[in-house]
Amino acid sequence: MNEIKTADNAKTYCGFIAIVGRPNVGKSTLLNKILGQKISITSRKAQTTRHRIVGIHTDGPYQAVYVDTPGLHIEEKRAINRLMNRAASSAIGDVDLIIFVVDGTHWNEDDEMVLNKLRAAKAPVVLAINKIDNIKNKEEMLPFITELTSKFDFAHVVPISAQGGKNIAELEKIVRESLHEGTHHFPEEYVTDRSQRFMASEIIREKLMRFTGDELPYSVTVEIEQFKLNERGTYEINGLILVEREGQKKMVIGNKGQKIKQIGIEARADMERLFDNKVHLELWVKVKSGWADDERALRSLGYMDE
């Protein structure tokens, strides 16, 4: 990767930070809060993030490159689950700092599995105890913190609210202190290394998660078939939603097409905010049986590029 040289000879600092944890503890929400905008999709469903998302936060001489990973989990029956675990595990290897995000309200066997993987990590680990806004009596956290710090030698322990922003500044201060002197890897205006095409597919997938609730399992993905700027300066985006069964297709389309229409309206609005440009979005739904267990299909959909 080409490094970015500054105009003067002022010292600059850069480093890589992995955000890890089990599914649905708020990793993507934390990254979005740090960056000040949404680049990593969120929903109440676990395992919303399927790819390693790189978020870039440049503040004067400091550039922190964050890797938001899929949630690590024990279940590995399907090819897509194995690939997500592989992506999350590989992110731990070559970073300057690891932020281990846990839910302050409970701990489970997936948390324990992540913690065991961190024992092999060379980088210092910060324990970020999230969702503290859901804990009325903060003294109740003390036994939880004591138990976790007895399990692992954390460099820092920071109770946070990724949603509300509580103690995020303190966490960012720890991140800055972990950065090494060196030239920045990305231009100052970059907030992610992902393409607009990729971000469009993620936005559509987020809306699918939100509008189908628990009706639709995780055997759904989005392929962008067209992404172009037309002569009027509008992005023309065609998204193909892949599901595994005919019944799932009906769920996505909804009664008289109302659900897919709402998904399209919300996705287009998010794209226009992110791309700062007018967007014309068209969506289709197609049944592709067994795609989540087919490594060739996963490769073509971008799940094996990491």
UniProtKB/Swiss-Prot annotation:
Ranges where the KH type-2 domain occurs: 212-289
Record domain Era-type G: where: 13-181
Name the keywords, alphabetized: Cell inner membrane, Cell membrane, Cytoplasm, GTP-binding, Membrane, Nucleotide-binding, Ribosome biogenesis, RNA-binding, rRNA-binding
Q: Which GO terms describe its biological process?
A: ribosomal small subunit assembly
Q: Do you know which PANTHER family this protein is assigned to?
A: GTPASE ERA, GTPASE ERA, MITOCHONDRIAL
- Tell me, in a sentence or two, what this protein's role is: An essential GTPase that binds both GDP and GTP, with rapid nucleotide exchange. Plays a role in 16S rRNA processing and 30S ribosomal subunit biogenesis and possibly also in cell cycle regulation and energy metabolism.
Q: Could you tell me what this protein is called? A: GTPase Era
* Gene that encodes it: era
